[in-house]
Structures are given as C-alpha cells and as structure tokens.
C-alpha cells in the first residue's frame, strides 16, 4: 500500500467537504466529519477510488453502563488473518466478527475497563484491496495456507453496517492478484492481471504469459484486487 500512499501525496489537493444531504442520522454526520478530518486538507483521486470507511462500534462491557461509542476509520486495504481458513469468506467472517473482552479500553462514562467491539463496513470504494496476512509480525514465518477466493461476485453486502439505510449491493470481480514466493527478506513477487480482451496474463519480471482462470488461486496469493461490478461515480461517505 506504500505506492498508493506515494501517489496520494503526489496528487493531493485541498477541498471543501460538505454534507450534501440533510439527515437526522447522527452517524451520517459523524462519518462525514471523520472524512473531513482525514482528507479535507489532502484529497486525491486515490482517495476517491481506493478508500472507504469502517465503523467500529464499541460498547462498555459493564452491564449497568452499556455506553456505546462509534468510531469511523478510513481504510484502503482489508488485512485478513488466514490461520485455519480455507476460503476468503471465512477470513471476512472472522474480521467482522464481534470481539469480546477487549481489556485495553476504558469507558469515558463509568471508567470501567473492557468492552465489546463490532466492526462493519460503512462505505466501500469502487476498488477494494484485500491482503492475506501470510507473515507473522516478525516476518520470519510465512503461512502458505491455500485460501480459495472468488474470481467473480465477491459479495461484501452483508458486512455493511445495518445502522446505515443502504439498499445497495456491494458485488466485486477480481481483476488482479499479487503473489509472493519464498520468505519476506528473500522472496519474489509477481502478478496476474485481467486484460481488456477478457483474458488473464501473468507478469513475472520480463516474462508475460497468458494463463487460465483456474491458475489464479495458489498458495502464493498475497494481495487481491477487486473492482465493483456496478461502479459508483461518487463515493457515499
């Protein structure tokens, strides 16, 4: 994601982000304010194309309190744990599963330590990037687990927050895969991409070869690139 950050910094400019629709929904207003805080001073076509917003709902685990905080977080890549997973939906279900007993959070209302956290998509970009977390934190151990992922019709609709009135479908098709073989410090990267002619091609250093769709899913798949089937011209924050 380093390249996206460089492109964003190079192309960024200041804009004025305004609420384009009146709404009594406080969450919508908060989401726009969060977007303004993050990008109003530095906006670019990269933000419009690759960035979305995640809603973290944090609830105090003290039953007599139940204080709820909603925190919006911009994202340009979903980093998914693949341990003991066989397909991408299992990874997504785990990522968006409710977390309980988070002990490093302190309630502002009752000062209780501990909460439950629920993560949901709030807005999704037209182009979604998904990273399969193959490396441990120290980078010394690689997980070569085979994770099946859809070439067509990846459905992210059910991972969207029910707190937002949204009847849209979020269906995506794969258009590129980045692969990695070896270990982090001495590995090799290459990519497969779908061309405008509808065929898939493998790009490995100076070699370009035509491949079949069946060759796309391997133990070396590292980063997946999806585009939305029905492109929205504007991002709904």
Language model region names:
Residues 32, 36-41, 45, 63-237:
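Exposed substrate/partner-binding surface patches
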Residues 1-74, 111:
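Papain-like cysteine protease catalytic cores
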């Amino acid at each position: 994601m380093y390249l996206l950050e460089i492109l964003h910094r190079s192309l960024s400019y200041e804009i004025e982000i305004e609420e384009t629709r009146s709404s009594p929904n406080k969450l919508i207003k908060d989401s726009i304010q969060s977007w303004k805080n993050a990008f109003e001073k530095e906006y670019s076509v990269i933000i419009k194309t690759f960035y979305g917003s995640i809603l973290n709902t944090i609830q105090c685990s003290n039953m007599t309190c139940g204080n709820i905080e909603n925190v919006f977080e911009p994202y340009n890549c979903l980093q998914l744990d693949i341990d003991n997973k066989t397909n991408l939906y299992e990874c997504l279900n785990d990522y968006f599963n409710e977390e309980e007993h988070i002990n490093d959070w302190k309630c502002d209302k009752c000062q209780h330590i501990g909460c439950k956290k629920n993560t949901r998509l709030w807005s999704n970009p037209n182009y979604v990037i998904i990273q399969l977390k193959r490396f441990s934190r120290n980078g010394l151990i690689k997980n070569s687990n085979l994770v099946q992922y859809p070439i067509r019709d990846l459905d992210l609709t059910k991972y969207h927050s029910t707190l937002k009135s949204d009847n849209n479908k979020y269906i995506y098709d794969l258009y590129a895969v980045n692969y990695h073989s070896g270990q982090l410090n001495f590995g090799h990267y290459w990519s497969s991409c779908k061309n405008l002619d509808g065929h898939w091609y493998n790009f490995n250093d100076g070699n370009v070869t035509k491949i079949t769709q069946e060759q796309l899913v391997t133990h070396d798949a590292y980063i997946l690139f999806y585009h939305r089937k029905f492109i929205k011209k504007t991002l709904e924050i």
